[in-house]
Amino acid sequence: KEKLEFTPLTEDELLITVDCQYGAGNVTKLPASNVAVIDHHQLEIEKLPLMFMDASCGSCSTIVWRLLLQEGFDANRDEELATALYYGLYTDTNQLGEIYNPYDKDMRDELQFDQSIVTRLKNSNFSLSELEIAGIALIRCIYNEANRYAVVKAEPCDPNILGMISDLM
């Protein structure tokens, strides 16, 4: 896999935050002069010039889908994108049980997604014992602030649990 490298933003670049708000408590505030926010939660920050917010939507996926449509891009041209958008709606709306916004309904009905991937994602839950392994490993991690690395020791477990631990570091 290709290693992703952090490149500081310059004046000509754009930082886009999705499903969160730049400067809110759940976002690390990177220095950026051009920031766009795409979110479906209640407004927590001062309004920005590039802000696409709709708290009536059940999912941020719906707002992304609408922005794509407005730009003339049909998400169904890319089945993986359509699947990701659908699964975002699925998870944010309690398995589609809390869909009230007409745009959410339109997206649900119009996306042509890969049902086998959605089924696989729906069935990829962690057991309590696996979550306990991850939790203990994270609580007991050793972090070297000077050199910016962490050492985590976990009990023997499924590689997916190790991946989750790594993602949370």
What is each residue range found by the language model?
Residues 1, 45-168:
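A structured phosphate/pyrophosphate-recognition subdomain
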